[in-house]
Design a protein with these regions (language model features):
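Gly/Pro-rich turn-and-neighbor structural signature
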Residues: 2-103, 209-264
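A generic structural motif
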Residues: 6, 122-124, 138-140, 150-157, ...
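Long, hydrophobic/aromatic-enriched structural stretches that serve as scaffold segments
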Residues: 78-136
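Glycine-rich, often proline-containing surface loops adjacent to acidic residues and nearby aromatics
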Residues: 82-83, 112-114, 143-151, 197-211, ...
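Short conserved micro-motifs at the rims of enzyme active sites and ligand-binding pockets
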Residues: 98-100, 159, 215, 270-276
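Long, contiguous binding/interaction regions
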Residues: 122, 129, 269-293
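Compact, glycine/acidic-enriched structural inserts
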Residues: 140-184
Length: 293
């Protein structure tokens, strides 16, 4: 399959998924809270998004087009304290210091990348924070990555069991080895070494899925649809549960851990900031309120 066709298929899927997620979130909010949508353009010169810059070449001024995207954020809803759904499609060149860590980038530093990421911070502290992302990156090689994970502030053994059962069933539809492999990867990735504790109850995490585009794209689509099912299921089950000020305090402390991970270790945050992504979109994963003790 032609590479440009692959890019179009993937980016269109991510856009479709962004719309589907936002529609479901608005339904959960009963349309009383709305997303604020921001379109942005990649600006590698300033290392931030939301603007344009121009290049003088051969006596003429050209706009530097290196892609962009759209991030949608809903704040202070009845159910969601903060939720962000970000789509991006960017291209350019990896900085030299970054090239050795990216497959194919040392051979040629040019890249194209598209992705969707979602982070949900809930008003009810009995409903866990949830995170999802999938991406497709092209250098001289091309591959998929992504995953999902859940971070409760109050443990719920039944919820954890059900969550992992759904993930295992989804993975088994594609390969019997996926769940064990990607769960282990997730447990190792979403871990705070300085705290010696996991960020949450895990999930799946995968990267560098290449060599069979159609098979891998089918899996990536299933990951997106499964996350949509999971967040609806968890939220609707717990949306009316009563909580206390002590529960909220625990949530704030857990959010502090969440912020620590994203700023210190998260691969997507580092990638976005080092490749000229939109700062607001990259940091949308940060919780609205957090505490440290």
């Amino acid at each position: 399959m032609n590479l440009e066709i692959k890019k179009d298929l993937v980016s269109n899927w991510f856009k479709t998924l962004q719309d589907a997620f936002c529609d479901d979130i608005c339904k959960i909010e009963k349309n009383k809270s709305q997303f604020k949508s921001t379109m942005w353009k990649k600006n590698i010169k300033k290392n931030e998004g939301g603007g344009e810059y121009r290049i003088l070449q051969n006596g003429k001024v050209y706009e530097k087009d290196e892609g962009g995207g759209e991030y949608r954020i809903l704040n202070n809803g009845k159910v969601f304290e903060k939720v962000g759904v970000n789509f991006s499609e960017v291209y350019g060149k990896f900085p030299k210091k970054f090239q050795k860590n990216i497959p194919g980038a040392q051979k040629d530093p040019r890249f194209w990348a598209s992705g969707i990421s979602v982070v949900m911070h809930m008003k009810n502290p009995l409903i866990p924070a949830m995170h999802f992302n999938t991406r497709y990156i092209v250098t001289t090689q091309d591959w998929f990555g992504g995953g999902m994970d859940v971070t409760p502030s109050k443990q719920d053994k039944n919820e954890k069991k059900e969550f992992h059962k759904i993930l295992k069933n989804m993975c088994n539809r594609h390969n019997k080895n996926y769940y064990k492999k990607y769960k282990k990867w997730c447990d190792e990735y979403f871990y705070l070494p300085h705290r010696r504790e996991p960020r949450g109850i895990g999930g799946i995490f995968f990267d560098y899925k290449k060599n069979d585009f159609e098979k891998n794209f089918k899996f990536v689509r299933d990951v997106g649809v499964t996350f949509q099912f999971i967040f609806n299921k968890i939220i609707k089950k717990k949306i009316k549960r009563k909580w206390t000020s002590k529960d909220k305090e625990m949530q704030y402390i857990k959010r502090g851990r969440y912020a620590e991970f994203n700023l210190l270790y998260d691969r997507g945050t580092k990638f976005g900031l080092q490749t000229g992504g939109n700062v607001e979109g990259i940091l949308m994963s940060m919780p609205p309120l957090a505490k440290w003790k």
